[in-house]
Amino acid sequence: MILACLFGARLGVAADSGPAGPERWIHPAFSAPSLQLPGTFDQQTVVVLGDGRLMTVHPKGNATVISSDAGRTWSEPRPIRSDTTPVVPTRGPLIRTREGVLILLFQVMAGLESRWDEAKRDWTPAFRSDLWVTRSRDDGKTWDEPQRPFAGVYGTITSAIQSRSGHVVVPVGVALKEPGRWGTYAIVSADAGLTWTRSNLIDLGGNGHHDGAIEAAVTEFSDGRLMMLVRTSLDRFWEIYSDDHGYNWREWRPSGLDAGAAPGYVQRLASGRLVLVWNRLNREAGAPSPKSASSASYYYGARGQRAELAISHSDDDGKSWAPPVVVVRQTKTSLSYPCVLERNPGELWIWTRYGSSPPVYLSVKESDLVDRVKRVPEFKR
């Protein structure tokens, strides 16, 4: 399965060895891919169809568009369902299994604007974000009736995989109360999205409407075990492991990878190498990131920066990682929510899904991760 989820924009930036415009610097080992996503910074996804074309969910939701030229241009929207039906699919992660089944996960929300009680530092009873699923077995020509496997308050999904065993594994945040925070489940399907099982809860504490265990990235190791890298407000990812296809996550520990309060993206390549792109805790040559105020509703004492994205790789299933290298930095607006797609074996596309406008689109060969992706001097305006 090839999956990428993103916040995209219509215009891209060409990568070169110097500043790409007055505010952005891109590592010289990276070039610009053909990918130019439709729409604005809204949650979208892109998958590779069986014939090599690309498909993404339209930024307005309830429709798909297809590219036959590697993402340069996109077709007119094809509706998923009638706008008059009781449940209309919104934007969300789109998965294509190896069997050719498309799975669209989406949320139906209520009470979003008043979701947080600042005085109680907790979620309001009116806030709902139910998780829904619809499937297509003919590459989007027709879709099944949407099903709601889980009701409640579920958060943004930033990563999903189909493991070699065929299980579809999707980390998803869930709103927890008293105090208000996020926890994380994995939802697992052994039948290409027809039915779903929810794992045990990952709860790391916290208090804030962006605090806790949130927006996890998931990958598979060579021995079939799964790992989630969970976004936290604790100055680093937490590593959570499963040895039973994602149904139970029994081993939890703080990662050796420092990270700010932002999600990363980890991708297992065809070669077996793991690639991670993320916002480190501090800028490469800057002062330590300040902690947020304890009264901030987002986090409780979190730190981080979104001015730089770093990349690293592992050749031993995450036991060790190559020294992180900054691949893009921006002096004013932020860079965050990265995504990695192995478009072809050894060809990586990387882009940002939130923060900067236009988004960053990067391309690099896997061989260059070892040979050319080295630390370069700090960018000077």
For the regions a protein language model found, what residue spans apply to each?
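Bacterial N-terminal signal peptides
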Residues: 1-10
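Asp-box/BNR beta-propeller blade signature and adjacent active/binding-site loops
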Residues: 15-381
